[in-house]
């Protein structure tokens, strides 16, 4: 597809993602989503993160929606999972989030949720693409009766935090938490959430100015929170990303606890209480071998998917699992929400710490992360590279040397002409040797001479 990637439509604000395109997306997307709407007129929720281009794109998108007769409810600044939850709560026909998640400030994106709170299917996205690509706009253009209306729905934020508070059985009194809001969508919500739950908390990166979202902070820069946790003497730290769908934690010593470890800690806790469906956690191929070893030792099963939270959610829905996610901090608790939810993940983790009385460092120590190295190689043909006999031989040779105590993953990039060679092994030295052994063969066989 030309416009839609794995996470909606993305681009550089005011360039590849222009207000003109946002207007068209409002018209075409709104029209497709409301063909089968249960409400007449159709109702759509719209929200954005804190980046400066959000307001420009939001106004254009809303104009497009109104022009095809849609009743629009504006949430203002809200998290992506907040939109997914509120669409279901309000019985809306769709939700639209304007955000480029953890990307830098110049990027932005527009992603759609169906009435069930799940990201759109490929089929729906293809329908929207077809209308966007069409030479002429044949969609309705009412002049008076039949135009849409716009209402504020700022109380949605309170409803969302109240819902989050009900996902854990106890308050957080007696806990000292450090919070990094990435200067993004969670900035205005976290203080209310932790204050309501009685926690003692310190916040950083919760003053968005439109330009500082994700800038050296948040889940993609957890070292900032690690320093802050030690400085404040907190027992745990949680960092979110720009649109609040990721969470990375930090223990009391300033050590980073990634999505793999968070999934394990929460999954094991639920399993011991008979609440982890099929005793299974859904992971992606990028999860560390240390996670799988820890799961095996605790009689937990795993199901692997391609990289991307949408594939994790697909597998969870298809086979009835309730916990899954990615190393990057997208963790999905399907009992509560339909997508990765950073604040929800933080609460589940904090609840385990409180209920078990253990330190986060103790809980995370069960997953012994193996050193990992990733090399990207520019190739002439990424698909042919995977079928190349000499490359296959090199991979088999390395796997033989590992003898089950490590792993290799060779996969093409989804967006560029790159082959990604990743290995995990007991020591950094070993992992480097293994990666280079395969990378050298890839270079010799299919490399681009620059």
UniProtKB/Swiss-Prot annotation:
Keywords linked to the UniProt accession? Isomerase, Magnesium, Metal-binding, Phosphoprotein
Entry GO CC: cytosol
Q: So which cofactors does this thing need?
A: Mg(2+)
* Catalytic reaction list: alpha-D-glucosamine 1-phosphate = D-glucosamine 6-phosphate
Q: Which residues carry this modification: Phosphoserine?
A: 101
Q: What class of enzyme is it?
A: isomerase
Q: How is it modified after translation?
A: Activated by phosphorylation.
Catalytic residues, chain numbering: 101
Q: What does this protein do?
A: Catalyzes the conversion of glucosamine-6-phosphate to glucosamine-1-phosphate.
Q: Which PANTHER family match?
A: PHOSPHOGLUCOMUTASE (ALPHA-D-GLUCOSE-1,6-BISPHOSPHATE-DEPENDENT), PHOSPHOHEXOSE MUTASE
Q: Which family does it belong to?
A: Belongs to the phosphohexose mutase family.
**What is the protein's name according to its record?**
Phosphoglucosamine mutase
Organism of origin: Ligilactobacillus salivarius (strain UCC118) (Lactobacillus salivarius)
């Amino acid at each position: 597809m030309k416009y839609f990637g794995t996470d909606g439509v993305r681009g550089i604000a005011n360039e590849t993602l222009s207000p003109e395109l946002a207007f068209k997306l409002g018209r075409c997307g709104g029209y497709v989503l409301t063909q089968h709407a249960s409400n007449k007129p159709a109702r759509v929720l719209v929200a954005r993160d804190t980046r400066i281009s959000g307001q420009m794109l939001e106004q254009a998108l809303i104009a497009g929606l109104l022009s095809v007769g849609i009743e629009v409810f504006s949430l203002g600044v809200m998290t992506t999972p907040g939109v997914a939850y509120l669409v279901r709560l309000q019985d809306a026909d769709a939700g639209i989030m304007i955000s480029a998640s953890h990307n830098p400030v110049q990027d932005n994106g527009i992603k759609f949720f169906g009435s069930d709170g799940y990201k759109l299917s490929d089929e729906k996205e293809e329908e929207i693409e077809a209308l966007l690509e069409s030479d002429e706009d044949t969609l309705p253009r009412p002049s008076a009766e039949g135009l849409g209306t716009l209402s504020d729905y700022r109380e949605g934020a309170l409803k969302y935090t109240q819902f989050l508070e009900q996902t854990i059985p106890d308050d957080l009194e007696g806990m000292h938490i450090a919070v990094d809001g990435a200067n993004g969508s969670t900035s205005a919500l976290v203080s209310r959430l932790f204050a309501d739950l009685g926690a003692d908390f310190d916040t950083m990166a919760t003053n968005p100015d439109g330009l500082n979202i994700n800038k050296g902070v948040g889940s993609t820069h957890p070292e900032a929170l690690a320093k802050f946790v030690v400085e404040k003497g907190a027992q745990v730290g949680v960092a979110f990303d720009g649109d609040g769908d990721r969470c990375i934690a930090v223990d009391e010593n300033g050590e980073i606890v990634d999505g793999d470890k968070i999934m394990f800690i929460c999954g094991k806790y639920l399993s011991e209480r008979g609440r982890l469906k099929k005793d299974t956690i859904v992971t992606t191929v990028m999860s560390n071998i240390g996670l799988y070893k820890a799961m095996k030792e605790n009689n937990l099963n795993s199901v692997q998917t391609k990289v991307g939270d949408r594939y994790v959610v697909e597998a969870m829905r298809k086979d009835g699992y309730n916990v899954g996610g990615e190393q990057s901090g997208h963790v999905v608790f399907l009992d509560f929400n339909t997508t990765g939810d950073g604040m929800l993940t933080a609460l589940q983790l904090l609840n385990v710490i409180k209920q078990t009385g253990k330190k986060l460092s103790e809980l995370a120590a069960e997953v012994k992360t193996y050193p990992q190295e990733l090399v990207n190689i520019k190739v002439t043909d990424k698909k042919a590279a995977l079928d190349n006999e000499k490359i296959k031989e090199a991979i088999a040779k390395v796997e033989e040397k590992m003898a089950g105590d490590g792993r290799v993953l060779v996969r093409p990039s989804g967006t560029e002409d790159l082959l990604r060679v990743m290995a995990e092994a007991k020591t950094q030295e070993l992992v480097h040797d293994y990666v280079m052994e395969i990378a050298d063969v890839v270079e010799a066989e299919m490399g681009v001479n620059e």
